[in-house]
Amino acid sequence: VPYKGADAELIESIENICYTVVTADNFRGSAIMVAKREPQHMTVDEWRELERNNHDIKYEYIDGHIYAMSSGSLAHGRIANNTIRTLEDALIAGGKACEVYNSDVATRISPTRYTYPDVSVTCDEGDRPAPDKLEVQAPILIVEVLSDSTEAYDRGRKFGLYRACPTIQEYVLVATRYQMIEVYRRTAQGWTAYQAYNPGDKIELISLDVHFPLAALYRNVGVPEGLDEHEGEV
């Protein structure tokens, strides 16, 4: 990965820590994995400096290790944009003072964990937009738009990271191969609530006290309503 930026010394130290593993699948929009070369960690400040100087790829930071974010399909991008627009409209209609951010904005889920969700929502006064603010500090809802390359991660380890963040109350997974939304909710007993929504359903997000039709998220996207019988499971 070609690094750009004035801080060549920092980039050289980062290259001593990690290397990028690229496969043919990367060119079809799958995840680019970054593996550490030596058993040493990058600090949060070093990661922030990397993000400021490198404009080609964004890196999530998890417990000292960085993971490059890949580009998605056109359907993925459209669904993410539809989700942002739909959430903003619902929040405005409900008079909610919340902010909706896209995947350009990092979200802090712990002092040593920062991700770039497809969509993050925060209702915290400290997360109002300002030139000096670079990260969402108190997300209440996270949305990830699924893809073949990231679905296992979004359902597995990444969901575990989000569950450990005390401010997150709901986690939404949006399918791209057919129209279905899954909502996981935190309750007094933990993450025990789950609900799947299908075409024709109205989605209810309890953490934001908003609702909207599932169809709004798939507007102008060529995604079938159901899974083709020959396609198998997600």
Positions of predicted regions on the chain:
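Gly/Pro/Ser/Thr-rich low-complexity, intrinsically disordered segments predominantly at protein N-termini
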Residues: 2, 9-234
